[in-house]
């Protein structure tokens, strides 16, 4: 297993639209393992392949306190099951150190493949619903900062660009 490099906003590669995974093979399972290792080391609760510069429709997630509930979503799709949007404070490993409220549906239906390529479906609420929407956004080249005002987004971009200049 290996810890992968996480791309940071405003890296243009984060805007790449991920391609569906055709076959779930050992290479994909190795990527899944590396993504979990990377996410746990960061530390984070979710990671999309786009964030590690692999443009495939793959998300890993673990919302548990003790990191013992790993979830894999291959080619995930979701649909909102409620029209009401609620604010939820979001952060992102690709936008380190920044947290902002984003309005999202609080209940969604998710369809995806598991690490063995088997299809599954689940209804998610609360943090899981928010997290899957956030990670699916990554697969579509979108970041949580895109939901913010231009002023807030530009302020975050400038601060991160300054950090990148200072730390290489």
Curated annotation (Swiss-Prot):
Cofactor comment text: Binds 1 Fe(2+) ion.
Active site (UniProt): 135
Cofactor: Fe(2+)
Keywords: Hydrolase, Iron, Metal-binding, Protein biosynthesis
Gene3D superfamilies in UniProt: Peptide deformylase
Reaction(s) this enzyme catalyzes, per UniProt: N-terminal N-formyl-L-methionyl-[peptide] + H2O = N-terminal L-methionyl-[peptide] + formate
InterPro entries to which the protein is assigned, alphabetical: Peptide_deformylase, Peptide_deformylase_sf
Record-linked HAMAP family: Pep_deformylase
Protein name, as recorded: Peptide deformylase
Organism: Azotobacter vinelandii (strain DJ / ATCC BAA-1303)
């Amino acid at each position: 297993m290996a810890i992968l490099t996480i791309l940071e906003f405003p890296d243009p590669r984060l805007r790449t639209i991920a391609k569906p995974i055709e076959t779930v093979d050992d290479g994909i399972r190795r990527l899944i393992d590396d993504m979990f290792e990377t996410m746990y080391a960061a530390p984070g609760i979710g990671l999309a392949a786009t964030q590690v510069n692999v443009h495939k429709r793959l998300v890993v997630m673990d919302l548990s306190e003790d990191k013992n509930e790993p979830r894999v979503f291959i080619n995930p799709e979701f649909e909102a099951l409620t029209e009401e949007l609620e604010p939820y404070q979001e952060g992102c490993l690709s936008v380190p150190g920044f947290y902002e409220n984003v309005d999202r549906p609080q209940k969604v239906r998710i369809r995806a493949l598991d690490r063995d390529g088997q299809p599954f479906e689940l209804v998610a609420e609360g943090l899981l619903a928010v997290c899957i929407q956030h990670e699916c956004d990554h697969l579509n080249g979108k970041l949580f900062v895109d939901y913010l005002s231009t002023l807030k987004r530009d302020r975050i971009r400038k601060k991160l660009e300054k950090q990148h200049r200072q730390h290489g």
